[in-house]
Each structure stands twice: as structure tokens, then as C-alpha cells.
């Protein structure tokens, strides 16, 4: 099986609507990550690359032309990603490496119909879950047309075609294309641009385990949800299994995560420092076979945690609503800074160890069940 925790190179997507500050952010983020000991590699925006070299979308008027254009972006993007990752892994072994991508493969979904995107996947024998979730993180920078309209322009990108209204529409479409990714962060325009970059770096730091201040969400026990008012969303099925650990300061778990019959598998090791209540979390993609082998090492004091996660966007925020199954049936938990109007809360459970995933995995006694009633 090998050392499952050695990640040869991390891939982080920087996406967003037109004029969101992606290109301007890349230089700053590259410098900051380099300061923290990472070798940083940047994959430029494929659409801009081919548009600036003659394949101009402004000359395309038919749906078939647009689909072929997006297919070209899809294939080039995938080739860039695989080539970069394979090459830097071989050339720079043993180094901390991160690839920053100016857009990722799922951005294509925002510019074609659902049927056309599914056809692109079928022709290549690919599935959406595998493509979306293989990145370590996705950072969505909101277009300046949403909250900073005075800064919306095409000066930094000659390939930019969109009006502010179109930019808003594309921005929302791109966000929805990434719904369901396990590490998806939205960076809005509530601060100046310098503050926006700092928040983007903080989000990346959290993904890469770089010590930094992170504004944490509260956790709420949900009383009721008006599902008729739920915005566009993705339903994700998650199974988590805690394994036997050699050290009490360490938690090891495996996770099955996916939808529509397609799944990815992860192994996570969480190292806890009880003195300052901090922790470092390492996560690695594993194969389905490795998952089934490792699940035989389940901690005998625990059971499998099953939940359905609903991922949705509301007021420029990304939400994950977890409804638990099995021994935790009836428990629904929301992590958020601000609670959507269509969700009613039973109580704030921030910091309550009873509702930690580790504790919810514990096998329940008859007394536990009576207390939950």
C-alpha cells in the first residue's frame, strides 16, 4: 500500500467570475507560499491562452462551435494538469510542492449545458465526482461586478468579453459547478482587494496546514429546514470510519465520499496538541481497494458514521448541511457564520464534544440513547 500520507504535489484551483482578481492574486499567493517553503507552479488560464492565440470565442455564433471550444479547453486543461503534476513530482522529489491553477476543469461546466457537459464526460470515460474532488482545494474569488462594480474592467485581460451583468451570471454558474467539493471557499468583496488576497491566502493556508488565523464557523443543531426554499444544491453521501490509532494524540479515519454511484476515498490523520488545543490534519486520496482493506482496522469502540451532506450557496456563502443516518438518525448539523432564513435552529453546539464526529462514531449504550431522546 505504501506511505499513504505522502502527497507528491497539492493542486489548488483559483477560480471565479470575470474580473475577480485571479490573475492579480497569483503573483502574491506564489510569493507567500514560497515564503513558507513551498515550490509553487502556476498553470495559466487555458481559455485566455487559446483565445489570445487565435481561437477567438467572439467569432463563434453556433452552439456546436461553443461546445467544441469548451471541449478544447477541457482537454488542454486536463493535459496541463496531468503533465505538470507528473513532471514536478519526478523532477523535485521530497520537496513541498503546490500547483496553483487559474481555473480548473469544472469551470467548463458553467459555459455549456448540462447535457453537453455530460456528453464531454461520457466520451472520455470520466465522472464528475472524480474530476471535481481530485483537487486539494478550490478558492472562488467573486467577480468585482458583485459588490465592487467600480473596479470591473477588462484592462488586465484582453480576452475578457463579458458585461458586468454577464459576469454576474457566469460567476454564479461557476460557483454552482464546484458545489460539492470538500474544500470549497468563497472569497467575496466585503474588503478592499488587499484584504481579499489575504483572505484567499488564509483559505489556502488552512488547506495546506500552514499556521494562520482562520475565522471559524459556528456549529448549529438544526430544528427544521424548509427544503422548498433550498437553492441549487448537491447531495453528497459520506461514510466515515475511525481506525485504531497507536497514539492517543492521533486520530486516523477513512472516508468514502461521492454521489450518483461515483465515489472517492480518503485517509486522514489528525495529530492533536492538547497543550494549545491545536491540530494538524493530513489527508490523502486512496483507492477503493485500500479503503476496503483499511476498514477492517476499525476502532472496535466505534461504528460507521453515515450522513448525507447538502452543499449549497446563499448570500455569497458556501454551506454544508449534514443529516446523519443510522445510530445518529434525526441529527442535522449546520456549520455557518450566518444561518439562512429557511433553516430554524434548535441550539448552538459550537465546542460541544457530544456532537464531534469522533464522539458520534462511538457505539451508543442504552443510556446514551435515552439521553438523546
Regions found by a protein language model. Give the residues of each.
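Conserved lysine of the Walker
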Residues: 22
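Conserved substrate/cofactor phosphate-moiety recognition/catalytic segment
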Residues: 30-76
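A glycine- and Lys/Arg-enriched "phosphate-lid" helix/loop adjacent to the NTP-binding pocket
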Residues: 111, 115-176
Amino acid at each position: 500500500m505504501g506511505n499513504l500520507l505522502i502527497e507528491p504535489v497539492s493542486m489548488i484551483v483559483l477560480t471565479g467570475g470575470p474580473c475577480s482578481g485571479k490573475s492579480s492574486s497569483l503573483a502574491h499567493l506564489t510569493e507567500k507560499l514560497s515564503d513558507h517553503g513551498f515550490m509553487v507552479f502556476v498553470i495559466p488560464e487555458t481559455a485566455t491562452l487559446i483565445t489570445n492565440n487565435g481561437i477567438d470565442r467572439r467569432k463563434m455564433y453556433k452552439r456546436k462551435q461553443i461546445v467544441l471550444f469548451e471541449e478544447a479547453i477541457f482537454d488542454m486543461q486536463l493535459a496541463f494538469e496531468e503533465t505538470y503534476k507528473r513532471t514536478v513530482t519526478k523532477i523535485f522529489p521530497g520537496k513541498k510542492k503546490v500547483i496553483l491553477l487559474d481555473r480548473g476543469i469544472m469551470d467548463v461546466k458553467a459555459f455549456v449545458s448540462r447535457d453537453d457537459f455530460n456528453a464531454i464526460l461520457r466520451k472520455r470515460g470520466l465522472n464528475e465526482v472524480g474530476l471535481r474532488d481530485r483537487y486539494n482545494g478550490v478558492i472562488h474569488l467573486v467577480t468585482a461586478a458583485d459588490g465592487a462594480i467600480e473596479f470591473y474592467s477588462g484592462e488586465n485581460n484582453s480576452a475578457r468579453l463579458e458585461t458586468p451583468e454577464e459576469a454576474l451570471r457566469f460567476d454564479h454558474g461557476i460557483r454552482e459547478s464546484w458545489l460539492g467539493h470538500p474544500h470549497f471557499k468563497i472569497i467575496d468583496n466585503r474588503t478592499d482587494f488587499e484584504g481579499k488576497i489575504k483572505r484567499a491566502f488564509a483559505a489556502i493556508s488552512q488547506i495546506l496546514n500552514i499556521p494562520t488565523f482562520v475565522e471559524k464557523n459556528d456549529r448549529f443543531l438544526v430544528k427544521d429546514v424548509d427544503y422548498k426554499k433550498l437553492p441549487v444544491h448537491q447531495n453528497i453521501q459520506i461514510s466515515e470510519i475511525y481506525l485504531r490509532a497507536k497514539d492517543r494524540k492521533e486520530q486516523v479515519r477513512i472516508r468514502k465520499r461521492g454521489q450518483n454511484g461515483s465515489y472517492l476515498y480518503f485517509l486522514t490523520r489528525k495529530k492533536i496538541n492538547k497543550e494549545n488545543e491545536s491540530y494538524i490534519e493530513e489527508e490523502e486520496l486512496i483507492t477503493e481497494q485500500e479503503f476496503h482493506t483499511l476498514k477492517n482496522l476499525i476502532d472496535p469502540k466505534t461504528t460507521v458514521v453515515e450522513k448525507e451532506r447538502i452543499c449549497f450557496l446563499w448570500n455569497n456563502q458556501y454551506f454544508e448541511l449534514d443529516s446523519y443516518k443510522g445510530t445518529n438518525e434525526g441529527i442535522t448539523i449546520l456549520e455557518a457564520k450566518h444561518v439562512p432564513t429557511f433553516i430554524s435552529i434548535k441550539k448552538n453546539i459550537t465546542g460541544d464534544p457530544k456532537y464531534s464526529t469522533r464522539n458520534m462514531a462511538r457505539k451508543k449504550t442504552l443510556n446514551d440513547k435515552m439521553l438523546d431522546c
